[in-house]
Amino acid sequence: TYLDISHPDVLMFLEMRKPTGDPNMRCLNLHHGINITDNFMKIVERCMTDPNADDGWNLIDPNSGLIRETVSAKELWQKILELRMETGEPYIHYIDTSNREMKDFQKEKGLKIHQSNLCSEIILPTNEQRTAVCCLSSVNLEYYDAWSRQPLFLKDVAEMLDNVLTFFIENAPNEVKR
């Protein structure tokens, strides 16, 4: 689960994996990440060179577009880094970089990156008409010697993943079919 750095719930969202956090908000089994924008990082960088710089960061309601609260970008960044040291999360995704580096043909189709998988190696563009799904597999390197000599092994793994997606598409409930 990713949340934008400007979302009004970002402070609570950051705390959800902290074992000492609010018990009503704790989600120790849910992994989470933050979409960090260029503008946020520019404010943080400016504060590093000028301690008196304005570090106000607006938390904006995504539905109304109204500013709900203004917080210190420097303190928010420090909180993110401290939580990463304590819990290993949140994951960080530089959303503007992902959108800037997207292929031109995808941009021309009106696609946009909204989030990533948590490890950030899979970043798929979407829009209202196009949903993306990431189907991953892993191979146990302990058994590398056993499978590396099998010429069809990786092809079989890829085909198995394709079969998983095909099965889902063919058996999806009507409300999620297009």
Which residues are covered by each model-predicted region?
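Active-site cavity-forming subdomains of large catalytic enzyme subunits
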Residues: 1-151, 170-178
